[in-house]
């Protein structure tokens, strides 16, 4: 299924969806730091970012967390620093296209400040 989905959407340009299977952000960060140590380069924000699993994709602008849980659960802890996060009470199987469009509409109307006050 995943290989077929990847082939089918390979030329799509407008929306990027990333699936994280058996993924843990804390392990990813430790792995990045160990790679930096092995390369004997400075431990900088940029070098950490370059050694994350997600180094070849942009940080998410928007995260949607379903299931009435207000936490990231070890998901993209580094990359989500300036993401807008929407928490939805519904469980994933009950999340609808209408729910998605409501969130997108709210997201479009946000003034993003990327950490600035």
Q: What spans do the regions from the language model cover?
A:
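Flexible, compositionally biased loop and terminal segments
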Residues: 1-117
């Amino acid at each position: 299924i995943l290989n077929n989905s990847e082939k089918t959407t390979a030329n799509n340009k407008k929306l990027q969806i990333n699936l994280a299977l058996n993924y843990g952000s804390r392990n990813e960060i430790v792995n990045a730091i160990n790679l930096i140590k092995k390369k004997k380069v400075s431990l900088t924000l940029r070098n950490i970012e370059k050694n994350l699993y997600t180094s070849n994709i942009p940080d998410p602008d928007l995260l949607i967390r379903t299931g009435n849980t207000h936490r990231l659960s070890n998901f993209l802890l580094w990359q989500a620093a300036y993401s807008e996060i929407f928490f939805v009470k519904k469980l994933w199987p009950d999340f609808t296209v209408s729910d998605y469009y409501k969130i997108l509409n709210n997201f479009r109307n946000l003034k993003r400040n990327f950490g600035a006050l």
